[in-house]
Structure formats: structure tokens, C-alpha cells
UniProtKB/Swiss-Prot annotation:
Organism taxonomic ancestry: Bacteria, Pseudomonadati, Pseudomonadota, Gammaproteobacteria, Legionellales
Biological process according to GO: tRNA thio-modification
Protein name: tRNA-cytidine(32) 2-sulfurtransferase
Function: Catalyzes the ATP-dependent 2-thiolation of cytidine in position 32 of tRNA, to form 2-thiocytidine (s(2)C32). The sulfur atoms are provided by the cysteine/cysteine desulfurase (IscS) system.
Classification via InterPro entries: Rossmann-like_a/b/a_fold, TilS/TtcA_N, tRNA_Cyd_32_2_STrfase, tRNA_thiolation_TtcA_Ctu1
EC code: 2.8.1.-
Record carries keyword Transferase: yes
Taxonomic source organism: Coxiella burnetii (strain Dugway 5J108-111)
Pathway listed: tRNA modification
Length: 256
């Protein structure tokens, strides 16, 4: 697939997500969380292209959180943002030391790291008056999270494309919800984004997400529709076919 075709495909799916879930309103100030990885770079680049087109009237701002991880170097990232003329701020908060101190060796850091990062993001967005917080999760993240929740937490849940935070003060959006990771990888390579590796997560083996990712990949080899069917399932819930006592009073569920 050519460079333009990949970009066109991704923009199509981002616009579809924006429209399907009413993610961005006219005049919104959208804070895009830029981690330095392929997904967040792709999100920021595509939203910037859509903004420049002019059919969607909104402003974007790149928020970068330097968590003081070993080897962090944001000089190329700064250069890329300056070149694109995208306003940004890089905020330094040493969450790395906290995670290393609190989590035993060999255990996954993702949960605590995510909580600390989320608190900082929410606080910054509120202080600066941003109306939307955009995250770079894509289709594969959504379906992997669904299986992880089922297998390891006993819950049917995932990452919604649009979410009101628990404190009711923030709206999170995931414009890449329909985008496949393989297309994002191609796009990131073509754009030559100056990626910053996550040395905290990347050093850990056998993470649950990687195991689930392999499982979905194996199933897709037998039936290529498996990933798209899983995504469709997230918007095709049949509560009457489940076992949740909060949805149904089974004692009183009888013929009149």
C-alpha cells in the first residue's frame, strides 16, 4: 500500500470515529497526549492534517510527559513539533522512581505507571482549560483489552472511544479506535517519526497484553474476521444473554 493510501485510509477511519462518537465539537481545545511512540505520533499527525483541512474547527495542543525514565531524549521530538508548528509543553515529573520503588522486581509496572500518568494528565488539562483529552489507543488495543479483562479480571469491558472521567470533569477521546496497528506501523515508518522508546515497559517479558495479542493473531490466521468481529462485539451487546444480576432480577424474571 502506497504512502498516500495508508494516510488516506487512516484519516478515513479517524473521521469515521470522530463522527460516530461525536468526539470533537466546534471550538474544542484538544490536548493530544504525545508519549513519543508510534501511536500518539500518528494520532497527532492525523488530527493536525484534519484540522488543517478546515472541515473540523478545533485547536490541538501536544502534551508530553517526561517521566524521568533512563535514556529519555526529547530533542528530536521537540524539533518535529517545532517543524509542524504544533504548540506543546513538555512537563517533567519523576514517576519512574516512584514506580521502581513501589513495584517489586519482575512485576509489571503498567498499572501504577498508568495511574500516576493519568493523574498528571487530568490535572494539567483542567489547569489549562482543555475541553478534550485525546489518547492514541487503536483498534488492536481495544480488542486486546477486552480479552484481558475477560481472562484476568472476570469483566466484560474495554476502552470506549469516548469517555467521561470518573470525576466528571474530563472527556477522553480515542480517534484511532477504528485504525489497525499494522497501518499505524506503516504510516509511522513512512513519516519517520522520531520515536522515543519506553525503557520501563520495554524491558519486561511476558506481559499479559503480548500474550493476548499473540492469541488474537493466531485466531486471525484461521479466520481473518476475528479482530473486526471482536471490535463489532463491543458495540453489539446483548444484555439479556448475559448473567449480570445488576441488569436482571432473575428471581422475578417470570412469565406474567
Amino acid at each position: 500500500m502506497s504512502e498516500k493510501r495508508v494516510e488516506k485510509k487512516l484519516i478515513h477511519y479517524v473521521k469515521k470515529a470522530l463522527n460516530d462518537y461525536h468526539m470533537i465539537n466546534t471550538g474544542d481545545r484538544v490536548m493530544v497526549c504525545l508519549s513519543g511512540g508510534k501511536d500518539s505520533y500518528t494520532l497527532l499527525s492525523l488530527l493536525n492534517s484534519i484540522r488543517i483541512e478546515g472541515n473540523y474547527k478545533f485547536d490541538i495542543f501536544a502534551f508530553v510527559l517526561d517521566q524521568s525514565q533512563p535514556g529519555w531524549d526529547d530533542s528530536a521530538l521537540r524539533g518535529w513539533l517545532d517543524d509542524k508548528k504544533i504548540p506543546y509543553e513538555i512537563l517533567t515529573r519523576d514517576t519512574y522512581s516512584i514506580v521502581k520503588e513501589k513495584i517489586p522486581a519482575g512485576k509489571t509496572y503498567c498499572s501504577l505507571c498508568s495511574r500516576l500518568r493519568r493523574g498528571i494528565i487530568y490535572r494539567y488539562a483542567e489547569e489549562q482549560g482543555f475541553s478534550k483529552i485525546a489518547l492514541g489507543h487503536h483498534r488492536d488495543d481495544l480488542i486486546q483489552t477486552l480479552l484481558m479483562s475477560v481472562f484476568y479480571n472476570g469483566q466484560i469491558r474495554s476502552m470506549p472511544p469516548k469517555l467521561l472521567s470518573d470525576n466528571k470533569r474530563h472527556v477522553l477521546i480515542r480517534p484511532l479506535a477504528y485504525c489497525q496497528e499494522r497501518d499505524i506501523i506503516k504510516y509511522a515508518m513512512e513519516q519517520q517519526f522520531p520515536l522515543i522508546p519506553c525503557n520501563l515497559c520495554g524491558s519486561q517479558k511476558n506481559l499479559m497484553r503480548q500474550r493476548v495479542k499473540r492469541l488474537i493473531s493466531d485466531l486471525a490466521k484461521e479466520n481473518p474476521k476475528v479482530p473486526s468481529n471482536m471490535l463489532r462485539a463491543l458495540s453489539n451487546i446483548k444484555p439479556s444473554q448475559l448473567m449480570d444480576h445488576e441488569l436482571w432480577n432473575f428471581r422475578e424474571l417470570n412469565v406474567d
